[in-house]
């Protein structure tokens, strides 16, 4: 339940809420007002070790619980999430800043991930082939791997943790969760509801904190696998450090998602799609559209409509249903984003919509409005870097081939979209674009939870993505059995 009092956040270890053994804390402000709403502990290594010990002890019994019984617990958890979805959305808006509409959408996507986890009995089924030789049968069995950990970002404080621990736990593992210290309140509520669903103590443990918690997770010998979502430099570090310590690691990283706009697109729907992809959630998502490659033939018309519609967007507190763009997560991030806008101007791009100029009525929050640049090229930082904000760059290209070439020159390859009514264009795009997730007239090509989620190149470090059968394979190990009976 949301209150006005400043909350002191705790860890959850072995079924109990406990104070961190450390003394260092970090203030958690409401991004829309700057007012402090909580203090989160920056837990030391000792807290991680206690959480791992609890998870390791719980694994001995939880891994032996029949798979259907594990799923029944998750059905109860799913029901509790559905019953509390309005409260969960409000917590997200309070501590993350995204609009209540965006937060409600995130809650639904998180619930869908838990729905996937409830189907684990089907997803964990192995394979069998009788009589591979005279009197000999062969089969593959899947087993849990032990204690696993998840490190999640601030931008989707519900959806991304729910990509991880429900599926891992359904597969018979136990879990140590480290969510972003910027959004600790939603993590607390997720854990509360988890134990209301009747799970045994120690199956899920929550350790709040920063880099010390991350390093402790990566170095702990009893953690078998680590799931991570965050920025590219940190993802690279997590992957390299975790694998060096013998862990299975999936690290989902940054993005610079391109959308190619063809002359045969549906102009109205394309403009609205680009606006939604670029500016919803304040652009703080790894699937946001941050570059539009528009073909010359339609460029002027597309840009005129895009600019006119973007200027209608209201900026402000996410609890106000009239607002489309909420605050950024922190003042430091706001200053970083303003630096990118200034660099775009200095590099010669044309600033068509200036998000630095927003109504003073938004108050003391960390606001930057929707921003659009035209005349961008590959030498500019605003094209090269992940800005993670409502900043959209437009590059004019002569045709589809040039648009694909431009997109593939980015070091990132998370998502890519084409807007077209031509099936051949869509096919050419699909076959030649380098991206892990592709959309054809789909604004945000984030797949449903029963498909894998992962990018290519600097957008992903690892082999198996999150969700779907990839997720089950990541959280289990195979045993191949060849047997003969006399």
From Swiss-Prot:
Keywords: NAD, Oxidoreductase. Belongs to the aldehyde dehydrogenase family. IolA subfamily. Pathway: Polyol metabolism; myo-inositol degradation into acetyl-CoA; acetyl-CoA from myo-inositol: step 7/7. It comes from Bacillus cereus (strain B4264). It is an enzyme of class 1 (oxidoreductase). This is Malonate-semialdehyde dehydrogenase. The keyword NAD applies. One of its GO terms (biological process) is inositol catabolic process. Disulfide bonds: none annotated. CDD domains: ALDH_F6_MMSDH. NAD(+) binds at residues 154, 178, 181-182, 231, 386. NCBIfam families: MMSDH (TIGR01722). It catalyses: 3-oxopropanoate + NAD(+) + CoA + H2O = hydrogencarbonate + acetyl-CoA + NADH + H(+); 2-methyl-3-oxopropanoate + NAD(+) + CoA + H2O = propanoyl-CoA + hydrogencarbonate + NADH + H(+). Its EC number is 1.2.1.27. Homotetramer. InterPro entries: Ald_DH/histidinol_DH (IPR016161), Ald_DH_C (IPR016163), Ald_DH_CS_CYS (IPR016160), Ald_DH_N (IPR016162), Aldehyde_DH_dom (IPR015590), MeMal-semiAld_DH (IPR010061), MSDH_GmP_bac (IPR023510). Catalyzes the oxidation of malonate semialdehyde (MSA) and methylmalonate semialdehyde (MMSA) into acetyl-CoA and propanoyl-CoA, respectively. Is involved in a myo-inositol catabolic pathway. Bicarbonate, and not CO2, is the end-product of the enzymatic reaction.
